[in-house]
Amino acid sequence: MSVIEINGQEKECQIMSEQDNIAVVQKAYNNFKEGNIQGLLDLMPDNVTWQLPEIQGVPFAGKRAGRESVREFFVGVEANQETLEFAPREFVAQGDKVVSLGHYRWRVKSTGQEYSSDFAHVFTVSDGKITGFQEYTDTASAARAYQRSAAA
């Protein structure tokens, strides 16, 4: 722990290196891959923000605020699609930001359709916790997979 001064008051805080922040993100991904959603949520404060693009027909897309809302996001992901591939491949960190570049592939349970995309995930990490997340991905591919019927 380190003590820093903020607005004339001393505050204890944990100074995290960029490599420490990458390790937090990698731990979160490992929890997700193992289905350990509680372990993933334990890496977030109560006031976490979680942002995916709005995608027509995708019930769990959009912005969420708070750990319970993020839990609902992961319940929605599990209820609506099957993970076929989830591969974060590169991690770049600067300050409190960690960017993960990777690729994933999903099957939509209601339509049977698959979609895949490269992604960029931008995490904000503070004191060893993920305080923010934003995803950049191929939204058109996901929308098509959710809108097609299995017979189409």
Which sequence ranges carry the predicted segments?
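Short, low-complexity N-terminal intrinsically disordered segments enriched in polar/charged residues
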Residues: S2-D46, R148-A152
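A solvent-exposed, acidic/Ser-Thr-rich amphipathic alpha-helical stretch
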Residues: P45-G95
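Short, solvent-exposed coil/turn segments at beta-strand boundaries
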Residues: N47, Q94-K97, F123-I130
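Hydrophobic/aromatic beta-strand elements that line small-molecule binding cavities or substrate pockets
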Residues: F74, F86-F91, R105-W106, D118-T124, ...
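A short hydrophobic beta-strand element
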Residues: D96-Y104
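Short beta-strand edge/turn micro-motifs at domain boundaries
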Residues: A120-R144
